[in-house]
Amino acid sequence: PRALRLDKMSLAALHATLSAYLDAEFAAREIPTLAMLSASEDELHAKALRLQKLLADAGVSSQLVRTGDAVGGGSAPAQELTGWAVAIEPGRLSVDELEEKLRLRAKPIVARIHRRQYLLCVRTIREEDFAEIAAAAAEAIR
């Protein structure tokens, strides 16, 4: 049927995608999901320290917390990877109020609340977003 025909652009895109997966090192570095899944515990700890420093520079208290990052999805619904998160101290706010303020921003910041802590799991946060997160957290807590 016509609905199943592939044009040259679709074939080229499929070829490029499959070629990227053939080089495991390239794939782990350049494909965002694979880069996140393959990040080592040491890399994540260093990343969490960098976010914590930016938060401190913005006047936000936080602590590092070791986490179990859920891989999720249909292929690995119960799999966890050891990771690191930055737990923001909410100041005068409750954890739920901090979560709501940051989630309702024009560019939402989505975190996880676990054991009454607001956790920013660094495995899935791009470093180029750290400064914006620190500024938003400082604004929310003020």
Which ranges hold each PLM region?
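Short phosphate-engaging motifs
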Residues: 10, 94, 129
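Catalytic-site microenvironment of enzymes
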Residues: 139-142
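Active-site C-terminal subdomain of aminotransferase-like
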Residues: 1-53
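Conserved C-terminal alpha-helix-loop-beta "cap" of PLP-dependent enzymes
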Residues: 41, 45-126
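Charge-rich, low-aromatic oligomerization/scaffolding segments with amphipathic character
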Residues: 129-136
